[in-house]
Amino acid sequence: MSGLLEISGLTVAFGRRDARPVLDGVELSVAEGEIVGVIGETGSGKTTLARTAVGLVPPRSGRVVFDGREISGLRGRALRAFRRSGRLSYAFQDPLRALDPELTVRRAVAEPLAVAGDLGDTEIAARVDEALETVGLDAARLGDRLPGAISGGQRQRVLLARAIATRPRLLIADEPVSALDASNRNRVLRLLDRLRTERGMAVVVISHDLSSLAGIADRVAVLYRGRVVEQGPVREVFGRPLHPYTALLIASAPSVRGGGGPGAAALPPSAEPPSWTAREGCVFGHRCPFVIGSCRTAPAPAPVGPGRTAACHRVPQWRELVAEATPPVTAPGPPELVAAAGETDKEAGR
């Protein structure tokens, strides 16, 4: 059964035709009422994926199909009409930049409804109040304030209210909690979960923070240098990662992994750096401690279980190498990778 959103073979590049793609052959599916997380380091292509999915960035190749209609090829009037429909909504990453500083909260939330052009003033006002109430904001108290006169957590919720005012079927939220304190972060995450359970809304959450997704996402896609290296049910991916890069991300998130260790960005290169470029071979080859000759060919995402894929030539051998290193003479990987893979193997054997 096809999903509400189907992304296939999506490639995006900026500048020259021979420029390295920002997204390279991305595959992603989102079903009705599902929360899907997209995780990865800064620069992995997460925001470009979100912006391409909603029609803000044209792809070089591939397809984006929403509710059975291909939208990646829409241009001009057809694209503007689709955006105005509000069925696919995007909550931008930075509220301060996304919200017009001269528009009050009420006017900011009303703007996409006014642009749609099919509602009267009375219904627009009612929809604005409904959206603000849904995100836990008092329209009577905050509606006439400017963005600069409310807190960061309130601005983030105004951005979400604006995104859901059109009653979309799918919301793409780009780093919705990255700049919030713990209290506001949890409030926004509960809101996203409630939109799914109460409205049947599908949600894509773009994040570099794994702990933000651990409690609410159904599935997760791991993006590295524009390619999806692993994808599957969130508990399975976080509990037993099948790609070395995923294991490093999890090891760097104490609240998810239960441990510590340096972040993925601190991973040193492999002992023998590959002679090929990331474009030719595995995108993770220049950092992977398990790189071998076959990694010269870029691995395609392959099924590794129900609903799971991993783009690695050495699944599951790299995990076996980690388990056998007791202690390693020549380390098969950095300590945090050994810890992450070793602990999850022990858990799997219980």
Can you describe what each PLM-predicted range is?
Residues 180-262:
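P-loop NTP-binding/switch modules centered on Walker-like glycine-rich loops
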Residues 71-89, 107, 115, 121, ...:
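ABC ATPase NBD coupling module
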Residues 167:
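Conserved catalytic motifs of ABC-family nucleotide-binding domains
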Residues 233-339:
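Charged, flexible cofactor/metal-binding loops and thiol motifs
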Residues 146-150, 154:
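Conserved ABC ATPase signature
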Residues 62-73:
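Conserved ABC transporter NBD signature motif
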Residues 54:
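Helix-to-loop junction immediately C-terminal to a conserved catalytic motif
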